[in-house]
């Protein structure tokens, strides 16, 4: 039985201040059990692992970004921060490459023990400058709704200051997925962002069906980021220059 899955759903962003701004887009995501990548490569037509296809997943799009083992990268960082790294299962929720192109503003790693209890969450955040920051959380209680919070440590939007806090909420993947991020400054909520989806089996039929619903999803995501940024600028929202250049940072959060 394959544990990996496909989720079709939507992304919502709502900005509350200094001016209200809202958008919603339909997307599909893959939830990949990293131990199944070679099986998926062999069994699912039009999907490939670390090589070109209509739909593909490359390890170099995540982790160290050098094509090295993503499983090893996860385990190395769990060990570094004293989180269980042996006898675990790793799943990643992300957008796939479509015709070789992808941009993942957020990828989520779900780390389970062998009893299928969630023990850690990694939020891998990217910006359009090719930079990446991963927030690692230890999960102390296996519940369906996981909640995490931390200070913002990475420049994402040029229209939001760095002096902010994130409040993450997510459901353990099942028939549905849900990832919600609320962003606050010292006074009020600035942003609500969410991604949800409904599960389908990871097979050729459902993969092609998802692709046909979203044939240019990668390009739509990239264009949407810039189009929505233009609309924010046109509304007169202050442009905040990026001050610090990083490549690939990782922090452990409480």
Model-derived segments and spans:
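Mature, function-bearing regions of proteins
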Residues: 1-254
